[in-house]
Design a protein with these regions (language model features):
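Transmembrane alpha-helix entry/boundary detector in multi-pass membrane proteins
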Residues: 7-14, 30-56, 80, 112-119
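Hydrophobic alpha-helical transmembrane segments of integral membrane proteins
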Residues: 85-109
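Membrane-helix interface motif
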Residues: 22-36, 95-104
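Hydrophobic alpha-helical membrane-insertion segments
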Residues: 13-21, 81-93
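Loop-to-transmembrane helix junctions at the membrane interface
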Residues: 64-89
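Generic alpha-helical transmembrane segments
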Residues: 46-64, 89, 123
Length: 149
């Protein structure tokens, strides 16, 4: 049976996958089929805010909740799930960063190029905290084993 931290980390992973898919597809949509932009009018600022608020920020909040729920030590599979979530964020935002120069200037606005960098930094922070939690939990288990001897 899985505990609450594992379920929340799985939720974070699911949101990260959804965010990655939405961001990559949205940025490719802004490039357009022939590189001239989308064939229909779209408000890129509104769509980007919607994508971030539906899946990007909730993924980060759920990851932070997992760290808050861990009292003394982290479970190995929970931290591995969080590291996978962070890797998905980092890799997908690296792909988005490579797509940004191809976007038509008519659809370009100030935050369009900054958002991927924010989520790369967030992914690095999640991976670092998860690795720290994993290392701390190993040390915690060792000290308990030493006390039982």
């Amino acid at each position: 049976m899985l505990n609450l931290e594992t379920w929340v980390s799985l939720g974070s992973l699911g949101m990260a996958v959804m965010f990655a898919a939405l961001m990559i597809s949205f940025y490719l949509f802004l490039v357009g089929p022939d590189g001239k932009g989308p064939p229909i009018y779209v408000d890129p600022q509104g769509v980007l805010i919607q994508i971030i608020s539906i899946s990007g920020v909730p993924s980060l909040i759920l990851a932070g909740t997992v760290f808050g729920l861990q009292k003394t030590h982290a479970l190995k599979h929970t931290t591995i799930i969080l590291i996978a979530s962070a890797v998905i964020l980092i890799v997908s935002m690296a792909i988005v960063i490579m797509i940004v120069p191809k976007i038509n200037r008519n659809y370009f606005f100030g935050g369009l190029d900054a958002v991927p960098f924010v989520f790369v930094v967030s992914g690095i922070a999640i991976a670092s905290l998860a690795a720290y939690s994993l290392n701390r939990s190993r040390m915690y288990r060792r000290s308990l084993e030493d006390e039982n001897r």
